[in-house]
Amino acid sequence: MSKVQEIIEAVKGLTVLELSELVKALEDEFGVSAAAPVAMAVAPGAAAPAEAPAEEQTEFDVILKEAGDKKINVIKVVREITALGLKEAKALVDEAPKPVKEKVSKEEAESIKAKLEEAGATVEIK
């Protein structure tokens, strides 16, 4: 049996009180905390300055809203754009609205939108 398996078996045999003591001892020994990280709430006033740079969006998401009548052509274009397999591309098209590509430049987003619309899809850029 490996060391890891031996440790797991030993931990299985401990009571809740002993497990609590073990956690405290590990925290002290290694200088870590077993507590879950707490998300910091941002004050509404602090968020206001961050809104000004947000107007100059540099990354865009291309969302497939609807495949339209030429679904096969849309699947082909989705495969070309994303390098997904046939099954994955078909699932993405079937589950529309879904993002096709995320965090791309404006030029790339416009190019993808044009290709998808040419294939018969309805597309949105966010």
UniProtKB/Swiss-Prot annotation:
Gene Ontology CC: one annotated term: cytosolic large ribosomal subunit
Signal sequence segment: none
InterPro entries to which the protein is assigned, alphabetical: Ribosomal_bL12 (IPR000206), Ribosomal_bL12_C (IPR013823), Ribosomal_bL12_C/ClpS-like (IPR014719), Ribosomal_bL12_oligo (IPR008932), Ribosomal_bL12_oligo_N_sf (IPR036235)
Any one biological process term the GO annotation gives: translation
Keywords: Ribonucleoprotein, Ribosomal protein
Function field: Forms part of the ribosomal stalk which helps the ribosome interact with GTP-bound translation factors. Is thus essential for accurate translation.
The protein's assembly and partners: Homodimer. Part of the ribosomal stalk of the 50S ribosomal subunit. Forms a multimeric L10(L12)X complex, where L10 forms an elongated spine to which 2 to 4 L12 dimers bind in a sequential fashion. Binds GTP-bound translation factors.
Identification of the protein by name: Large ribosomal subunit protein bL12
Gene: rplL
